[in-house]
Amino acid sequence: MTAAPEGRKLLRLEVRNSQTPIEKKPSWIKTRARMGPEYQELKGLVKREGLHTVCEEAGCPNIFECWEDREATFLIGGDQCTRRCDFCQIDTGKPAELDVEEPRRVAESVQAMGLRYSTVTGVARDDLEDGGAWLYAETVRQIHQLNPGTGVELLIPDFNADPGQLAEVFGSRPEVLAHNVETVPRIFKRIRPAFRYERSLEVITRAREDGLVTKSNLILGMGETPEEVTEALRDLREAGTDIITITQYLRPSPRHHPVERWVKPEEFVEHTRTAEELGFPGVMAGPLVRSSYRAGRLYAKATEHRGMPLPDNLAHLAKAGTAAQEASSLLSR
């Protein structure tokens, strides 16, 4: 393998990664396709209207559950990221010009799909003077304006912890402000060279101080130890993280970081217990859990824990329900 799919020459790291064959998944890495009525209706609507979601385009295994709950995820900022993380499927390169109409189109897609809760994520845009802060903030504003009954979770890059850029984003008041740390300090620089562990924690702390519900994610299987996961959870909680999701790393291609270990459901259950003991109001852990999985319900848990009443238009999120990809659910089958 000498070139990436987008035609650029492979980085030395990618050449080294590609020398390790793609790993065979263990038996517990699987999902069941349960196509309920809400999913079927949404699937047909998305096809008819030509809408685009991360759920479909990334082949997310949880699409059946999330769409049944009328939840979906959108990617903004284009398909080229200015940073490269060794686990991420998104290409690294020179992004296209900023599309100022994108926030409106995303809001219209949310409306057309009748979503109850939407997650918006995007690429890092270090090529822009504001790092893309306006784009992220405006997308939240447009969704809220056109869909006052829909919750918005905003998953952001770190914006280099720039106070002005963070203020722009925080001022859009998403229901949840997410910034994913993804891995533990010892291997952080190797996995996420353009980010800094302490800077990511700082972003979360600032969001919490601004009164936002905060969220982060850890990906296991990239070389960390269970003990290091516990320490990272402690760091995240002390930084002010309300919601934590924990998942198994699945290698997107040979040029990405090899899978170092397959984490059994039993270990995910242990990490859930640890996170709950540390005081996280919302916890979801399992091999196929993703950061936007059951996002609305986790938001409802966090607001209840903080004594914040759920807005009437989002009261449905407090309803109890199962989560098929949660580790405890896998073990009970």
From Swiss-Prot:
Pfam families according to UniProt: LIAS_N (PF16881), Radical_SAM (PF04055)
Binding sites annotated in the UniProt record for [4Fe-4S] cluster 2: C81, C85, C88
Cofactor: [4Fe-4S] cluster
Binding site for [4Fe-4S] cluster 1: C55, C60, C66, S292
One GO location term (cellular component): cytoplasm
Main location: cytoplasm
Keyword Iron: yes
Location of the Radical SAM core domain: 67-281
Cofactor, free-text remark: Binds 2 [4Fe-4S] clusters per subunit. One cluster is coordinated with 3 cysteines and an exchangeable S-adenosyl-L-methionine.
EC number: 2.8.1.8
Compartments in which it is found: Cytoplasm
Keywords: 4Fe-4S, Cytoplasm, Iron, Iron-sulfur, Metal-binding, S-adenosyl-L-methionine, Transferase
Reaction it catalyzes: [[Fe-S] cluster scaffold protein carrying a second [4Fe-4S](2+) cluster] + N(6)-octanoyl-L-lysyl-[protein] + 2 oxidized [2Fe-2S]-[ferredoxin] + 2 S-adenosyl-L-methionine + 4 H(+) = [[Fe-S] cluster scaffold protein] + N(6)-[(R)-dihydrolipoyl]-L-lysyl-[protein] + 4 Fe(3+) + 2 hydrogen sulfide + 2 5'-deoxyadenosine + 2 L-methionine + 2 reduced [2Fe-2S]-[ferredoxin]
Stated family: Belongs to the radical SAM superfamily. Lipoyl synthase family.
Entries under HAMAP family matching the protein: Lipoyl_synth (MF_00206)
Protein name: Lipoyl synthase
